[in-house]
Amino acid sequence: MARTFTLIQIRTRARERADMVNSSFITDSELNGYISASYAELYDILVQSGLLYFTPTAQTITGNGSETYAVPSGYYGTVRVDRQEGSNFYPLQEYMITERHVHENGGGSEARVYSAQGSNISLLPAPSSGTYRHIYIPAPVDLTASADSTTIDGVSGWEEYIVVDAARKMLQKEESSTTGVERDLLRLKERIEEMAQNRAWSTPRRVVDVRSDKSDSANWWRTTGTL
């Protein structure tokens, strides 16, 4: 991604869009809060596409006999969990709550399945040892108190969503009409949701067999050394 803008640039564009360039009715601090909330909404839309617009981060978990392990403070959502053996990684399957009894009663020293639960990752059976790699999407940066030089990636003009949504909030507080910006916001959202699916051009999105024995963490031929 290369289309980046600073927080002060986004703030200026939002003021221009709301026709409040020289107005002190909305302070910069308050506008930063609007922008931060709008950025988080754009972040949600891009994550929902299922494609990696934001670089996943890895957390190392060491089994100690417990079932649950705290996720990092900057956690948004889990991509996958792998069990490590040497230089190889074996993918764990995600379990549904209705399947819990099957796995917690299974015994064994190594976890075979995982589940993201609140601020924790559940591994079952509770591993008494071993190393696990938790790959997750980080949460969006809180721009409320960020420096003016903080950059925002607009990908392909999608920063306009943040600009228009922040302008809408400014006009809303001023009790001015928001009809025009709401119409533009809807058009932008539809465009982003459609085009966000086109991040990978060479390989079409496909259904993955997650119940096959080949995806079980006990099978060596499904190893992976990298994400």
What positions do the PLM features span?
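Glycine-enriched, solvent-exposed interface loops adjoining structured elements
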Residues: 1-227
